[in-house]
Amino acid sequence: ASPDCRRVFRYLKERGISGEVLQRCVHLGILYESLPYHNAVFIGRDENQVARYAFLRGIYDASGKSFKMEQAGSEKAYAFCVPAKSGCRRVAVYEACVDVLAHMTLEQRQGSRDKYRLELGGISAPKEGQSQRSMKKPQALEHFLSQDPEITEIEVCTDNDFAGRWACEHIRKAYEGSYRIIENLPEIEGADWADMAKMAARTPEKRQNREAR
């Protein structure tokens, strides 16, 4: 692993993610920069802090798309999770690791309360217009809830597209009898939380450019 995560930090900061959020994840041992390819590696750990899951994201975009891959042997039950700093009864769930960091950054600026933040390891939704099959309960969320009986609220932070709305609806139906469900999708159609963080980071730049004219 790279000793300073310099390239990964630069890549993620350019996408609107705060240095404080990144430093916290590195301190927790759930984010590092791989060598020699300098991928961002997101780690999921079990109850004994043993790494059981890893997701790799390339920092060099080719044709607008970066390399993304779950490490072979990863167990989705132990997907990437940023723990709450203190006792907390809410877990927020996301489609992707970067969405976790992006939403943390946005809420940090607003002074929102602390919560557990869990990546689901992606979702498997039907294509829009196809038959509406049911969704299995996410392994990562099922395992998390089994390990923390104090949780009473699930905040669904999936993407605001067909697949994300489909997943949100099915998670709500699966858990609303036992948990309070909060639906918190990005306000812009088609966006994920990573998109929202990028837009928020660009807004001050646009304002400064206008003022300089």
Where in the sequence are the language-model features?
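Helix N-cap/beta->alpha junction signal
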Residues: 95-98, 160
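Basic, glycine-enriched DNA-binding surface that flanks or lies within the catalytic cores of DNA
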Residues: 1-77, 82-85
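TOPRIM fold recognition
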Residues: 88-89, 105-213
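Short, well-ordered loop/turn elements at secondary-structure boundaries
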Residues: 36-38, 85-88, 97, 150
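Contiguous, well-ordered alpha-helical segments that form the cores/surfaces of helical PPI scaffolds
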Residues: 40, 100-107
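Terminal peptide-recognition signature
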Residues: 12, 42, 49, 95, ...
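Short, catalytically relevant binding-site loops at active-site mouths
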Residues: 60-61, 98-100, 123-126
